Structure formats: C-alpha cells, structure tokens
A protein has these predicted regions:
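Bacterial N-terminal signal peptides
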Residues: 8-16
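Short loop/turn segments immediately following beta-strands, especially the blade-tip
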Residues: 62-69, 163-170, 210-219, 260-268
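Bacterial Sec-dependent N-terminal signal peptides
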Residues: 15-42
Length: 353
C-alpha cells in the first residue's frame, strides 16, 4: 500500500512540475519579444548598436545570429523618433549609447545632426526626454550619473549640458535649459567613472571636464591637468576601453588611437594595431570579452543608396574582430547589411567603464 501511495505521489508531482514549466526545455522556442526584454539581451556581450543614416534609426544586433550573408537577420531591437519633426532639416541619428542609468533606468540615448536628442527607455522604447536644440550637427551624446545629458556638436563647435533630470520632477521647461561650452568641431563625449570627468573630443582637443553643482545647477569645469592637444587629430569617436580602465579609444582622420588617461599620450603602439588602426573610422569600440568592432565609409558602392548625399560617410558593413583561441590573433568578420547604411557602431555594454 505504501509503495502504491509513493508511486501516486511521484506521478502527481511530475504532472505539477511539467505544468509549471519545470523540466526539459531543450526544444522550447523563444519568443522574440521576450528575448528583447530578457536579461540576456541586456547583458549580451556580442551585441552592437548602430546608427543608420538611410533609415534614420538606431538598430541593435545580436552578432551571434550572423550567418555570413545578411546582418538584417540579426536585428533584435530598433528605435526611431515617432515624430517627423525630429528630422526636419535633415540629418539622421549620429550618436547613440546604451546605459544602465541609476536615474532613468536602462536607457538608450540618441542624438541627430539636426539638433534632435533624446533619452529613451530600453527595451520598451518610450521617450523620457527630448530636445530639438542639442546643437548644429550633433555627433555624440552622454548621460551623466545625475541624469543630465551632454551633447557634442560639430558645426556649432559646442558642448551642451542639459538639465534633463528635471523632467523627472515634471519640470519640462527646466529640462530643456542647457549650458554651452566651446568645443571646436565637437564629435565625441564620454563619462569616466574612474576619473569622475566628462571627456570630449573635437578637431584637435581631447578635453576633460569636472562636473560641479547638482541638478539643474550642474556645470562643466575644464581640467588643465588632463587631456591633450594634437593638431591634425580631427577627432571623431570616443569610447571606453573595456579591457583597461586607464585607456580610451579615440578615432581621428587618419588613425585609431589608444589614449592613456594618466600620461595624456595618444598612442598607435597597442595590441592588434595592425588590424584595428585604420583611417576615417566613424565608430569604434570593444567589449569586455576582447572583441572589437568599427565602421568606416565605403560610399555605398554597389548598394541602392550609393548616389545619396549621405553615402560619403556611410557603409553597409560592420567590421568585427574576435580573439582566437590562443588570444594572439584576431579573426575579422565583415557583417554586411542588405538594406542599412551605417554611420557609427557602439558597444551594447551598459557600464561607463
């Protein structure tokens, strides 16, 4: 009798476990919508985010899905402003970052050449803050630990700091207010949690700014003891080195530089420089797993958009570099899209450093 009771108990327990979804999940299909909002999607190390000039949007790719044919099949998330007003006067999205922000939560921050900038919640895509006054030909955006946003713009030679955090107190008027600083041909901006400074790169300056004040009273103070001046740099992109917190990556007109924060040196003597150092790189970065990625214009040769005005700074390929088994070599993978014209590419690692 006890034996039969035990067997009955086992059967009931098995049925309950299956009904609760516990058991063999090897053949269970994943819901794409669940994938976009899952922890693995947020933390994925082989994810990159790119700005698309022809579609005027940003796209998130899972490069593990790349089959060597069409990068479009790897798209798992995208964002484009709901209002066409965001694109009046032209200019696609030129800057984007993903941040695990302590003020707004997980966000994607974007800026566009016509002055549009926004904080967008991830993964639901809700616009939390936006402006059409980020600067003339805005190129890069960063969100500070305070929730305020900094935008570098090239044609206007500006670095603007917005009191965007005020929107959380429903003060939209104050959230649109900004302080402006001169930055010749502003192209890149990046917060550094180690040095507690905002880095910004322009035509020949790589500057570091201390943030003083709080909330809408925050302001930037230039540090004379950090940064560097390099005539002919033509700085373009600025990103963290996720393998060494003492370095930044800086792309220029002719090279990809490794910047030593402590010494202020822009160096071309770095590991894998024979593959990574290229001219006219628009977007560059790495991931904590040791992979690298970049975009550089190929003028859309052979694409449907090669005669468009933006072809001169766009490409249909994202170059990815993966460490070999011994770590001594980098494998190059050219991820090609059949429909997208890319400008910049960014790491989807949500930490600042």
């Amino acid at each position: 009798m006890k034996k039969w009771c035990f067997l009955l108990y086992v059967c009931i327990l098995s049925i309950w476990l299956v009904s609760c979804g516990v058991g063999d999940l090897s053949d269970k299909e994943s819901d794409p919508e669940e994938l976009q909002s899952s922890e693995s999607a947020i933390k994925g190390t082989n994810y990159v985010m790119a700005t698309c000039t022809n579609k005027k949007c940003v796209v998130l790719y899972d490069l593990d899905l790349y089959d060597g044919e069409n990068l479009d099949n790897c798209e798992i998330w995208s964002f484009a402003p709901a209002s066409t007003e965001a694109y009046e006067g032209g200019g696609g999205i030129s800057g984007v970052k993903y941040r695990e922000d302590t003020v707004f939560g997980d966000v994607v921050i974007v800026c566009a050449g016509n002055g549009y900038a926004a904080i967008v919640s991830y993964p639901d895509g809700e616009t939390l803050w936006e402006t059409l006054d980020s600067g003339s030909n805005s190129h890069a955006i960063e969100i500070l630990p305070s929730g305020n946003v900094a935008v570098a713009a090239s044609s206007g030679d500006t670095l603007r700091l917005f009191a965007s955090s005020a929107v959380l107190q429903n003060d939209t008027e104050k959230a649109s207010v900004y302080k402006e600083y001169f930055l010749k041909d502003g192209h890149g901006v990046l917060w550094d949690p180690e040095y507690k400074v905002l880095w910004a790169v322009g035509q020949e300056d790589l500057n570091a700014y201390t943030v003083a004040g709080e909330g809408s009273d925050e302001e930037l103070i230039l540090r004379d003891d950090l940064g560097t001046l390099k005539p002919g740099l033509y700085g373009h992109d600025l990103s963290a080195d996720f393998l060494d917190a003492n370095y930044l990556w800086v792309t220029g007109g002719s090279h990809v530089y490794h910047f030593n924060k402590e010494t202020g040196e822009l160096s071309l003597d770095y590991e894998f420089g024979d593959k990574l150092d290229k001219p006219s790189v628009k977007g560059f970065g790495n991931n904590p797993d040791g992979s690298y990625f970049l975009t550089m214009p190929n003028y859309g040769v052979g694409t449907s958009w090669e005669k468009e005005s933006y072809a001169g700074w766009s490409t249909d390929k994202i170059f990815c570099f993966y460490p070999g088994e011994d770590g001594a070599e980098l494998e190059t993978v050219k991820c090609k899209s059949e429909t997208r014209a890319f400008y910049k590419v960014f790491s989807f690692y949500g930490k600042y450093q």
